[in-house]
C-alpha cells in the first residue's frame, strides 16, 4: 500500500513483523503493546507480568492514541483495575484462559456498570445493570474489559460514525474511516490499544 502523508506511523503496530519478546523481565508498557495476545497470556501465566501491568500499558496507549483516532470513546478504568485485583494468575490460580488480558467490547454489547450507547442518542446515557452473556463468559475466563469501541448507530452503517461520539479515523490514513460496523474494534487493534477486541457481523462488518 502506498505511504500516505496522513498515515499514523507513530501509532501503528506493524502486524507483518514478529512481535515475539526478547530479553528478560520486567517488560515495559511499550514492549507489551507490540506483543500478540497469546504472548501476553503466556507472560501472565508464567507470572512475569501482572494484569495490572497490562492495564497500565493499555491505558497509557489508549491515552496516547484516542485523541487522534477515536476508536474507544468509553473506558472503564476503575472497573478494570478492580477486576485485575481480584484475579489469581499464579500457577495454581483460577484466572481462566485469558489470565487477566485486557479486552475491548463493541458498543453494541452491554457491559455491567459501563456506559453503553449502541451509537445512538436514544441510549446516550444508558448504563446497563447486567452484562451480555458474551461479556460474562469472557470475564469468567479472565478477560478484563477496558472500554467500549465505537460503532455506527445501532450497528447499521458501513462507516464508523455516530451522533454520540463522532467518527473513528483509520490509522493508516486519517482522511479515511475504518468502515463499519466494527471499525472501532479494528482501529483499536491496529494501533495496539488492546490485544483482543470484540466485534460482531450481521452484514460484512468482520469480512
Features from the language model and the residues they span:
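An N-terminal boundary/leader segment
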Residues: 1-76, 81
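Hydrophobic face of alpha-helices
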Residues: 52-56, 102, 135, 139
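Conserved hydrophobic/aromatic pocket- or pore-lining residues that grip, position, or stack substrates
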Residues: 58, 80, 106, 138, ...
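Short alpha-helical functional segments enriched in proximate histidine and acidic residues
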Residues: 61, 65, 83, 87, ...
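Long amphipathic alpha-helix in the N-terminal Rossmann-like dinucleotide-binding domain
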Residues: 78-85, 142-143, 152
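Glycine-rich, aromatic-flanked loop segments that form ligand/cofactor-binding clefts
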Residues: 90-109, 143, 148-150
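Enzymes and membrane/adaptor proteins characterized by extended Gly/Ser/Thr/Asp/Glu-rich
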Residues: 97-134
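Short glycine/serine-rich loop segments
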Residues: 130-207
Amino acid at each position: 500500500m502506498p505511504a500516505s502523508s496522513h498515515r499514523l506511523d507513530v501509532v501503528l503496530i506493524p502486524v507483518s513483523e514478529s512481535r515475539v519478546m526478547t530479553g528478560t523481565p520486567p517488560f515495559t508498557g511499550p514492549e507489551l503493546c507490540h506483543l500478540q495476545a497469546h504472548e501476553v497470556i503466556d507472560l501472565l501465566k508464567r507470572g512475569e507480568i501482572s494484569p495490572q501491568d497490562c492495564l497500565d500499558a493499555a491505558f497509557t496507549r489508549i491515552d496516547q492514541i484516542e485523541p487522534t483516532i477515536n476508536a474507544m470513546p468509553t473506558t472503564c478504568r476503575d472497573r478494570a483495575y478492580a477486576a485485575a485485583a481480584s484475579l489469581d494468575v499464579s500457577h495454581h490460580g483460577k484466572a481462566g484462559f485469558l489470565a487477566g488480558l485486557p479486552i475491548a467490547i463493541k458498543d453494541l454489547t452491554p457491559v455491567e456498570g459501563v456506559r453503553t450507547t449502541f451509537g445512538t442518542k436514544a441510549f446516550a446515557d444508558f448504563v446497563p445493570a447486567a452484562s451480555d452473556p458474551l461479556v460474562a463468559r469472557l470475564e469468567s475466563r479472565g478477560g478484563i474489559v477496558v472500554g467500549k469501541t465505537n460503532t455506527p448507530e445501532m450497528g447499521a452503517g458501513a462507516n464508523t460514525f455516530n451522533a454520540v461520539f463522532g467518527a473513528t479515523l483509520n490509522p493508516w490514513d486519517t482522511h479515511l474511516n475504518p468502515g463499519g460496523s466494527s471499525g472501532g474494534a479494528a482501529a483499536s487493534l491496529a494501533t495496539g490499544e488492546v490485544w483482543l477486541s470484540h466485534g460482531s457481523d450481521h452484514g460484512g462488518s468482520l469480512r
